[in-house]
A protein has these predicted regions:
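Polybasic, low-complexity RNA-engagement segments
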Residues: 1-40, 272-275, 282-434
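Conserved SAM-binding loop of SAM-dependent methyltransferases across substrates and taxa
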Residues: 102-115
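Class I S-adenosyl-L-methionine
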Residues: 162, 215-218, 222-329
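Helix-to-beta-strand junctions that scaffold the AdoMet/dcAdoMet cofactor pocket
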Residues: 114, 210-212
Length: 434
């Protein structure tokens, strides 16, 4: 591999005798892995589990497979999986993933929350925020709001609000050189220092959003000390934080002069490059006096939703019902009014109000477990291939007309309308594949 000018010399100085093994590891193939989604009701048994992780496995799952389409698995390399594992929120917590796209860490945080509490997944890039929405919906997370904002604008709404903030910061990307060689095109000796300036700027806003006793998990996919240990030392000097120890598992090593932090090198850890630090906020931020979100449905809309829910659902969905145009969303409770922010997904998309009727969304059919739905229809592998390509499906027998959750391998793939023995196609056009 042809490294950028100055890279080899830098890491020979940092790593000493280990530099040779470190540099040789770039000639090896990048490590692929995925996580199994514990929010799904019909798990599949997978081999080659990643040691000391709850849901991780080495290997690849096709993006065109039923496992991927239903959100049962999420592809994410092993080092990246360690960040949310360090954060490990408890159900009921208020959590912010500040730089969330494409969604690996947010889906993992949502798995820990298990539908309780609030997860705000933020992405400043509009294009990447759309990908984030797709991945969160496929995962079936019900308590997630996706915002498309800068950290400073979020800070105006969420002062002192979050129990946990995860920042996988924009960085020089050295840890991705093996997986994405194009990342080397941007690298220069002074690039890490440029990135560090942006990281400090984002973190300054992040700190103001922490509740007293709240935790901050800071990570990068680079090895540059300027963006890692130097940033952590800056946080400890500028703000009232305690540095919490990160458990070094699976070949992680201590950070440079900061043994509580963790580094992942590809010659020691079976994965790509990552740094992670875990801090607890001891300072005080003004307690937020925010206006809570409220339902804005008309009586007719409430009646239409209740009619659908009574006929099709076995559970009551907790949260705040809000319409945006003719679209119905379920917002997490205790969420501030987000009217001043750019929103990419305002909670769980439940469906659409049409003339005197309500049509369920694809996202709702992904989020609900089969045990929570009164009517479902299972399709086999052959029918799945046709369905995701946009075709209608001929069922083996006629069913009563109406809406059914489509199941593949026991997991939801949206809702669809059945007429007799015909399953109409409601798989979103933008997601279809052959």
């Amino acid at each position: 591999m042809q490294f950028p000018e100055g890279f080899v010399e830098k890491y020979e100085e940092i790593l000493g005798d280990e530099a040779r093994d470190f540099l040789a590891s770039f000639e090896e193939e990048a490590v692929s892995a995925f996580r199994v989604n514990p929010l799904k009701e019909a798990p599949v048994s997978f081999p080659d589990a990643i040691p000391q992780t709850p849901w991780g496995h080495y290997g690849k799952v096709s993006g065109k497979s039923p496992e991927h389409a239903t959100g049962l698995v999420y592809s994410q390399e092993p080092a990246a999986q360690m960040v949310a594992q360090v954060a490990q929120p408890s159900p009921g917590m208020k959590v912010l993933d500040l730089a969330a796209a494409p969604g690996g860490k947010s889906t993992q945080l949502a798995a820990y929350l298990a539908g309780e509490g609030i997860l705000v997944s933020n992405e400043i890039s509009s294009k990447r925020a759309k990908i984030l929405v797709e991945n969160m919906e496929r995962f079936g997370a019900t308590n997630v709001v996706v915002t498309n904002e800068s950290a400073d604008r979020l800070a105006k709404v969420f002062k002192g609000y979050f129990d946990l903030i995860v920042l996988d910061a924009p960085c020089s990307g050295e840890g991705m050189f093996r997986k994405q060689p194009d990342a080397m095109d941007y690298w220069s000796l002074d690039y890490p220092s440029q990135c560090a300036s942006l990281q400090r700027e984002i973190l300054a806003d992040a700190v103001t959003m922490l509740a007293e006793g709240g935790r901050l998990v800071y990570s990068t996919c680079t090895w540059a000390p300027e963006e890692n240990e130097e940033i952590v030392n800056w946080l400890l000097e500028e703000y009232d934080f305690d540095l919490l120890p990160v458990e070094h598992i699976n070949g992680m090593v201590a950070g440079i002069d900061l043994p509580e932090t963790a580094r992942m090198y590809p010659h020691q850890f079976k994965g790509e490059g990552q740094f992670v630090a875990h801090l607890q906020f001891k300072g005080e931020n003004p307690s937020p006096k925010f206006k809570a979100s409220k339902s804005n449905l008309s009586r007719e809309q409430v009646a239409l939703w209740q009619e659908f829910a009574k006929k099709h659902l076995k559970i009551n969905l907790p949260g705040i019902l809000q319409t945006f145009g003719d679209q119905l969303y379920l917002l997490p409770e205790l969420l501030p009014d987000l009217g001043k922010l750019k929103i990419a997904r305002n909670g769980l998309h439940l469906g659409t109000f049409k003339k005197k009727r309500f049509e369920p969304s694809f996202a709702l059919g992904l989020a609900l477990k089969p045990s929570q739905v009164k009517q479902s229809v299972e399709i086999d592998q052959e029918a799945f291939v046709k369905y995701v390509a946009g075709e209608t499906i001929q069922l083996a027998e006629s069913l009563p007309n109406g809406w059914y959750q489509v199941l593949v391998q026991g997991n939801g793939l949206g809702f669809a309308k059945v007429t007799g023995n015909v399953l109409k196609n409601y798989f979103p056009k933008g997601l279809r594949f052959k």
